[in-house]
């Protein structure tokens, strides 16, 4: 093996899924979405005797990548899924989805208008932390997303992502050591709060929250600064820490946050425990 050759992946070539609806899938991706059909493989099995004969067809999905489908000839269709709205009702099935990037908010709304004009049920726009999206389903029930970037990712995003996953792994290890499971994201947030407190050399017993110094969370920090009972510090270049001697309380509508951002509000880390958390109000108290 040539160790002098640097290894680098150059992007996603294609994604693939099975389909039991040949005509409908072709018409949806080629005609409704306007993706050119660029390649088809037809084969008698693929080695193992148990592998059925199949068609494997590819649509151009932009920037040199394709989206592909396997159509297995004569194979029984799995239990038919009922017609589902473009909302994540089946979290396991819907976790597998394709998201296409568009260039602007105007383009995103234009896609929504075009799809609805063709009879496709489309979700309302959903603002996440760094993207805004619409969702719909193909004839197989697969989730499809079209999204626009709200900002570019920064080094802090990568650092915060690594801390979140480190906290999740630690929380799972602690739970496994006690024959338990991590069932609530609060456990991960609390572990991340402990990690960040240790890295900053401080003791944060709560109620307190670490807030990444990112634009989507700026209204939380601003609201805390205007509350005389809250203390705002920056113990780390990438994080603010909001603390109080009493409970911390925030209102989603007053902060101007969309639901998808609101429900991930404590991704920076939590000191204490969440006493109340509904669609508009959160209250954090001492552990």
Predicted regions: what is each one?
Residues 1-5, 11-21, 58-62, 82-199:
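Vicinal oxygen chelate
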Residues 51-53, 128-132, 238:
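Short acidic/glycine-enriched loop/turn segments that link adjacent beta-strands
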Residues 237-239, 246-287:
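Helix-rich interaction surfaces within compact, conserved domain-sized segments
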Residues 213-227:
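Short amphipathic alpha-helix segments
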């Amino acid at each position: 093996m040539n160790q002098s050759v640097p290894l680098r992946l150059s992007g996603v070539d294609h994604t693939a899924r099975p389909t039991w609806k040949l005509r409908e899938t072709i018409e949806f991706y080629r005609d409704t979405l306007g993706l050119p059909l660029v390649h088809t493989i037809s084969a008698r099995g693929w080695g193992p005797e148990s592998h059925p004969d199949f068609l494997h067809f590819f649509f151009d999905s932009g920037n040199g990548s394709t989206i592909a489908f396997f159509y297995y000839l004569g194979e029984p269709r799995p239990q038919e899924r009922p017609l589902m709205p473009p909302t994540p009702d089946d979290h396991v099935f819907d976790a597998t989805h394709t998201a296409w990037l568009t260039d602007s908010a105007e383009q995103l709304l234009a896609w929504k208008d075009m799809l609805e004009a063709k009879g496709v049920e489309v979700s309302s726009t959903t603002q996440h932390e760094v993207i805004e999206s619409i969702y719909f389903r193909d004839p197989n029930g697969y989730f499809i997303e079209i999204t626009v970037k709200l900002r570019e990712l920064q080094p802090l995003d990568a650092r915060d992502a690594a801390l979140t996953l480190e906290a999740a792994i630690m929380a799972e290890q602690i739970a496994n050591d006690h024959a338990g499971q991590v069932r609530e994201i609060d456990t991960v947030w609390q572990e991340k709060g402990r990690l960040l407190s240790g890295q900053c050399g401080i003791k944060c017993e709560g109620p307190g929250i670490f807030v990444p110094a990112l634009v989507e969370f700026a209204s939380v920090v601003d609201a805390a600064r205007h509350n005389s009972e809250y203390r705002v510090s920056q113990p780390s270049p990438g994080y603010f820490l909001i603390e109080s001697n009493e409970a911390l309380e925030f209102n989603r509508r007053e902060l101007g946050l969309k639901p998808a951002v609101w429900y991930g509000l404590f991704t920076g880390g939590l000191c204490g425990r969440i006493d109340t958390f509904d669609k508009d109000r959160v209250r954090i108290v001492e552990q």
